[in-house]
C-alpha cells in the first residue's frame, strides 16, 4: 500500500510542477472566487459519475441527438483563422453552424472529452467524423473530417477559463484533472484553449460548463 501511495503523490507533485511552469508569465496558481460574489459549487467542475460502464463513449453526454449527420452536405462558411490547427466553420441543412478542427489531434480531443465526461467532468458537445461532404466554391466534394463542435442557442460561450486562477484550485477533482492531462501528454494548457459555457436547460435553469 505504501509504495503505491508514494507513487500517486509523486504524480500529483509532478503535475503541480508541470502546471506551474506551462506558461512562462502565467499568473500565480491560487483559488479565485467570482468577482460578483456568486457561490461556486464543486459540481460545476465535477460530479460523481456513478456507473462509468453505462456512459455513452460514442456520442458522449449530449447523445446522438446533437451529433453531426454524416450523410448531410455541409456548406462552407469560413476558414479557421486562429491557432495552428487547420479547420473551418460550416453550416448543415438544419442551419446549425459547426466548428470543424481538421488536425490530427481532432479525434484525440473527442476521445479525451469522452473519458473526462465518463469520469464526471462537464464537457460541451463535441463529435468526430472521419470525412464529410462539403459544398464550397469548388462544388460538392468529400472533405477530410475532424472534430465537430456545434454552435447551439442553449450553449453560450462566456469567456476563457483560467487554469491558474479558478475556484477549484487545490481540490481533488482539479488535481486529478491535471494528472489525467499529464497521462494524455496534453502540454498545451493555454487559457485561451479553454472556454467557459453557460448551458440553458429546458426548464429555464442554467449551468456552467
Q: What residue ranges belong to the model's regions?
A:
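Regulatory N- and C-terminal appendages and interdomain linkers associated
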Residues: 5-12, 18-76, 92
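Intrinsic-disorder/low-complexity loop/linker signature
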Residues: 37, 138-139, 203-204
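Intrinsically disordered regions, especially transient/low-confidence alpha-helical propensity segments
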Residues: 43, 59, 95, 158-160, ...
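Short, solvent-exposed loop/turn and secondary-structure capping segments
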Residues: 58-64, 111-113, 192-197
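Conserved ATP-binding subdomain of kinase catalytic cores across diverse folds
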Residues: 63-164
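Conserved kinase catalytic-core segment
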Residues: 108-109, 159-209
